[in-house]
Amino acid sequence: MTQQNAQSTSEPTISENDLIAQRHAKLKQIQDVAKETGKSPWPNTFKREHYAADLQEQFKDQSKEQIESAEHVYVKVAGRVMLNRGSFMVIQDMTGRIQLYVDRKGLPKDTLETIKGLDLGDIIAAEGYIGRSGKGDLYVHLEGFELLTKSLRPLPDKFHGLNDTEVKYRKRYLDLIVNEETRKTFEIRAKVVAGIRAFLTNERFMEVETPMMHVIPGGASARPFETHHNALDMPLFLRIAPELYLKRLVVGGFERVFEINRNFRNEGVSTRHNPEFTMIEFYQAYADYKDLMALTENMLEKLALDILGTTDVPYQGEVFSFKGPFKKISMFDAILENNPQFTPENVGDREFLAKFVREELKEEVKPGFGLGKLQTIVFEETVETKLRQPTFITEYPAETSPLARRNDDNPHITDRFEFFIGGRELANGFSELNDPIDQAERFQAQVAEKDAGDDEAMHYDAEFVEALEYGLPPTAGEGIGIDRLVMLFADAPSIRDVILFPHMRRKEG
């Protein structure tokens, strides 16, 4: 059945206010009858026994003749009316749609009148036996019927569904009613979260919950949201990352932990950024960043196979292969590979990169920017969007990796990776810094950057440093953006398409 047919109705083309008034009048009639009979106009006693998709699956191999020649199979279904042609209706439940056949000869006149007066969007209960039409559609031959919920507003646009993007985001419930693709997107999201949870649990990780409000924002370089605790009369910050709490748990002996939860960053909104977003963050003791790259490859490949049935994932006209192993290249080499005008000496020259950032990238170079910071800017501006197929970028500068362990052979870089696909960062992981003295010094450097005007630099967290002083075993940690991963699997162009209720500007009036 097409979207157009599903939205058809016999209602005349009149204003929405008039349609609403008509529905209120119908509700008044229902209430009057309910009062006379002692029944509720909003009944709540019907118990559904069958779902549309289950019935479609159960009878998919049975022809019209086979169904008619067998003993009747009686069912009880419920759902929202999406089509009402008098002789048959279509209802929609959480699994899909099924037709209801209205036998004009077998139903009382008052029941037929009630069915005729149903509006699209009304929620009904139906009982009857299974049949199949000459066109091959499965239906329920209606023998019993009850209006459960009267819809007082008409569904959006009768023939074209809900196409206004802003309305889709503001009124997601309507989007879910009329757009099957939207429902599929959020079913994929649920499978992604469940799949990650199952994978990590199977690897002996323990799921935990850590605070959402922090005394000191930390765990990432980002601008936080600030709030105030009235009873304690103190400022608090919505968390930008759970990292510092999760590592405390590893200190405490929980050697494999993960958390799936929200982070909040008071930054810009775009097709890939929302101020409130979902992350999976996990930590594994006695592992390094290379172990987590391997784990990530295995987990993403399994998710793609389990959810989509393939490792070749189509996204916005491209096809990304989730079949591991993925490409691995250092940030230094990635800059060279994507900027053929550079020599290795150029990429290692602070003054050369500072001039390039100022003159070619048209970005400010602050006095405190070191070589690592400038390399990171050049990478972000000239390389990131070119990383189409799954790629691990490794060996990030220590200057821009305040929580990562320094590389044993080169202290100016860290044992860190970021994972990119489709030109977007999807994950960030590293061997954790477990030297409390080095960590304290890096926090102090971050404070200096904050004092110099960098709003995203980290605060000094003395309590975390104290926890490290008790001893953090060799550990690796990683965070993966759930929303961006769902975008890939659902072929969604914007992060707002995969968040049920994305943040919007306040609607005037």
Curated annotation (Swiss-Prot):
Key words of the record: Aminoacyl-tRNA synthetase, ATP-binding, Cytoplasm, Ligase, Magnesium, Metal-binding, Nucleotide-binding, Protein biosynthesis
Family: Belongs to the class-II aminoacyl-tRNA synthetase family.
UniProt cross-references to Pfam families, sorted A to Z: tRNA-synt_2, tRNA_anti-codon
Obligatory cofactor(s): Mg(2+)
One GO BP: lysyl-tRNA aminoacylation
Protein name: Lysine--tRNA ligase
EC nos: 6.1.1.6
EC primary class: ligase
Residues engaged in binding Mg(2+) 2: 425
Catalyzed reactions per annotation: tRNA(Lys) + L-lysine + ATP = L-lysyl-tRNA(Lys) + AMP + diphosphate
